[in-house]
């Protein structure tokens, strides 16, 4: 009897008590997941669900091909890399797969080879992790994203208003016109039969407008009839070709997208029955929110968005997106993502003057907030004017954490700004020499931007206008990038932005262009990224650790060398005497979506001989003592001599440590602690008299490193000093309270510590 090689191998493995290599056939219908940082759903430990139990994958023979297949099965476009040796922590339960072998073209892991289910000689210290490209396949819905497109979303993906009246054509953005939908590459009309204001509300929401107004249908009907009587009219030609695609739409008005409405598609061409008998194209008129109205537009009536809303968005890269925060009990707080959906998210978007919600995001996808979690299980019906009108539970009732902070991405009007800026010469699409389009003598012209005064704030506006997220670098020299040959002329100079502008063209700039160094190699450039870190201080720790110390001058030589003492110390009789120091600890969290890293590499760090350490950021924090009217009476600063992960929450591992000239940074979710007993962790108040003051700490004060939100970089406390003792109270980050609450808090004496 002859034995074939496969049969021999099979029998041999059975004699050894080992099952043969197999291809797990059920994996195609079995779920995969990544277990890692909440703010980075595209990376983590790879786990597989088999027989109702989650298990891990061993890193033996795992490489980029296997990572690519896993990422593709998870809905991501590609894999960036993989991680071995349990980089994302050791898993629990079985190790389901070992020696996974893929070619790289498979659509799922079930098409790859392996040892078989549960057959492994690995331990959990070998659990593999993968890092996928954050961009998902078109149409793929993330488990942490609720997307607006419904079952017919592919056909109804694009909607626009085609202006008819001359006045509407001159308006930017277009707020009134005939509704058109794009189908098979062609724009089609929508019949007005049965058209309601609810339909208009949905269309306006999709286009980024918070509300709709009735149109003069009789006037538009006259225009329609007039054009239909003209045999040369393009409209008559389109109608004869049965260009209507949607015969009838029925919306409730709460839908975030027309795809969620009942849609009756018009009969195909060639049918005897006309698509819109006796009707015409549907016409809609929308009202733009305050961000998108022309400057001369009259303010809205009382009771509209002109009132300061009690909801805001934070840490979003684009206008109309961010973590949802609400104002309750005079304090800003977040919203838990339990039962968070597009209906509730749309109420937030419209309240802020945007359109309906494009996405409702869960799991702190746009960073974690601070302070209280005010709301949970928000249940809006869609007609509410504000989020506070919706039924909800208190956030503390169901154990929500800031890992569950809800966020939104709203529909915003197309202002055309993205077509007025571009990047040239970069290695990747997210970087390059900045080129803008401006009008010169009434003619649009492309050119470059002078780099004088160019900084991270201006670069942030540029990246936002480009739709590329946050700016991570603002380049003042761009000789290493070649621009577009016809855009070499400097057409914009003296750019100064506040950071809230939608486009560089809205920033302050020179009238006539004036670039003293003439441009050339000194042209503005940017590097953008879709996510950024976010540093926030622990206010309670500062308040609890503050005390006074009279420190002898003999122990302050190094601190004096690093300018950590007041100027009066220069005139003292060293080493005799002392300085009175207000000391405290600071704890700085990174609640963003990427690690906080120094601006420069290790080769550029400055060595300080006295303290014998490197400074990766020369001025990392400012410490100030202010009078109640804001005048500075004492100051201090702290260089970043050791930017590291002092500690991390359970489930995250420290990645940065300063020992042995190691890499510096703060991992997402971790924190860096500067204890009260280290040098320069103080404010020198030797020359300050008794009184009431404001104690202020600002981290990353010069914006040297990009962050998703700079408004929470400042911490303030009320400070009482009687000449012998000091009290700090009411410590809070700079944007925790509205302005009127700040004034009220200053009058309240909530003394929580008495540390001398």
Swiss-Prot record:
Instruction: Quote one Gene Ontology molecular function term.
Output: copper ion binding
Which organism is this protein's natural source? Homo sapiens (Human)
Any one GO CC term of this protein is: extracellular space
SMART domains from the entry?
Answer: SR
Q: What is this protein called in UniProt? A: Lysyl oxidase homolog 4
Entry function: Catalyzes the oxidative deamination of lysine and hydroxylysine residues in collagen and elastin, resulting in the formation of covalent cross-linkages, and the stabilization of collagen and elastin fibers.
* Record note on cofactor: Contains 1 lysine tyrosylquinone.
Catalytic reaction(s) noted: L-lysyl-[protein] + O2 + H2O = (S)-2-amino-6-oxohexanoyl-[protein] + H2O2 + NH4(+)
Q: Which GO terms describe its biological process?
A: collagen fibril organization
| Annotated Pfam families | Lysyl_oxidase (PF01186), SRCR (PF00530)
Main location class: secreted
Tissue-wise expression: Expressed in many tissues, the highest levels among the tissues studied being in the skeletal muscle, testis and pancreas. Expressed in cartilage.
């Amino acid at each position: 009897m002859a034995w074939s090689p496969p049969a021999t191998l099979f029998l041999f493995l059975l004699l050894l008590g080992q099952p043969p290599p197999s291809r797990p056939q059920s994996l195609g219908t079995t779920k995969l997941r990544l277990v890692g940082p909440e703010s980075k759903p595209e990376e983590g430990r790879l786990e597989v669900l088999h027989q109702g139990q989650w298990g891990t994958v061993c890193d033996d023979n795992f490489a980029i091909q296997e990572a690519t297949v896993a990422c593709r099965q998870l809905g991501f476009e590609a894999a960036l890399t993989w991680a071995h040796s349990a980089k994302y922590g050791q898993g629990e339960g079985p190790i389901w797969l070992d020696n996974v072998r893929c070619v790289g073209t498979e659509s799922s892991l079930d098409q790859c080879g392996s040892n078989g289910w549960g057959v492994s000689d690995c331990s959990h210290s070998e659990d593999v992790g993968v890092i996928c490209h954050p961009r998902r396949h078109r149409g793929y819905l993330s488990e942490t994203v609720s997307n607006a497109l419904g079952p017919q979303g592919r056909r109804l993906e694009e909607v626009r208003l085609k202006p008819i009246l001359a006045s509407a054509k001159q308006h930017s953005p277009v707020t009134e016109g005939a509704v058109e939908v794009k189908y098979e590459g062609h724009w089609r009309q929508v019949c007005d039969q049965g058209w309601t204001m609810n339909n208009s509300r949905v269309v306006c929401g999709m286009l980024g407008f918070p509300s709709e107004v009735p149109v003069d249908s009789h006037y538009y009907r006259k225009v329609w009839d007039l054009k239909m009587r003209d045999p040369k009219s393009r409209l008559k030609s389109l109608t004869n070709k049965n260009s209507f695609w949607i015969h009838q739409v029925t919306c409730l008005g709460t839908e975030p997208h027309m795809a969620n409405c009942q849609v009756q598609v018009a009969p195909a061409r060639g049918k005897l029955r006309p698509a819109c008998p006796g009707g015409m194209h549907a016409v809609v008129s929308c009202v733009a929110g305050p961000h998108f109205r022309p400057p001369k537009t009259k303010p809205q009536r009382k009771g509209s968005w002109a009132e300061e809303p009690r909801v805001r968005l934070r840490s979003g890269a684009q206008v109309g997106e961010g973590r949802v925060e609400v104002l309750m009990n005079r304090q800003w707080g977040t919203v838990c993502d339990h039962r968070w959906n597009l209906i509730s998210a749309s109420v937030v978007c419209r309240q802020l003057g945007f359109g309906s919600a494009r996405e409702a995001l869960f799991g702190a996808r746009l960073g974690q907030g601070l302070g209280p979690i005010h709301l949970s299980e928000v249940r809006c019906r869609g007609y509410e004017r504000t989020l506070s009108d919706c039924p909800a539970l208190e956030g503390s009732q169901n154990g929500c954490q800031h890992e569950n902070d809800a966020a939104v991405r709203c529909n915003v009007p197309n202002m055309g700004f993205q077509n007025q800026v571009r990047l040239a010469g970069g290695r990747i699409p997210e970087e390059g020499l900045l080129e803008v389009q401006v009008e010169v003598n009434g003619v649009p012209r492309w050119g470059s931007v002078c780099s004088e005064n160019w900084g991270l704030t201006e670069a942030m506006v540029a990246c936002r206008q480009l739709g590329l997220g946050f700016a991570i670098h603002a380049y003042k020299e761009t000789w290493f990038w070649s621009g577009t040959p016809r855009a070499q002329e400097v057409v914009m100079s003296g750019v100064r932005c506040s950071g809230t502008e939608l486009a560089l063209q809205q920033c302050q700039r020179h009238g006539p262009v004036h670039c003293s160094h003439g441009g050339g190699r000194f042209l503005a450039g940017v590097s953008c990224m879709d996510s950024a870190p976010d540093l926030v201080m622990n206010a309670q720790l500062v308040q609890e650790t503050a005390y006074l110390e009279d420190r002898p001058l003999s122990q302050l030589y190094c601190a004096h060398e690093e300018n950590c003492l007041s100027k009066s110390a220069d005139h003292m009789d060293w080493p005799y005497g002392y300085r009175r120091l207000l000391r405290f600890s600071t704890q700085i969290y990174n609640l963003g979506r990427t690690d906080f890293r120094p601006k420069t590499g290790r080769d550029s760090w400055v060595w300080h001989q006295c303290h014998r350490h490197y400074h990766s950021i020369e001025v990392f924090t400012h410490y100030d003592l202010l009078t109640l009217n804001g005048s500075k009476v004492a100051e201090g600063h702290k260089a970043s001599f050791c930017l590291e992960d002092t500690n991390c929450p359970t489930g995250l591992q420290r990645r940065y440590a300063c020992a042995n000239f190691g890499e510096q940074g703060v991992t997402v979710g971790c924190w860096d602690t500067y204890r009260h007993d280290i040098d320069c962790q103080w404010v020198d108040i030797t020359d300050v008299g008794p009184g009431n003051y404001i104690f202020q700490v600002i981290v990353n004060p010069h914006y040297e490193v990009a962050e998703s939100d700079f408004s929470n970089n400042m911490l303030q406390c009320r400070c009482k000093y009687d000449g012998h003792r000091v009290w700090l109270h009411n410590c809070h980050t700079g944007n925790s309270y509205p302005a009127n609450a700040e004034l009220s808090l200053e009058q309240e004496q909530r003394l929580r510590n008495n540390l001398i």
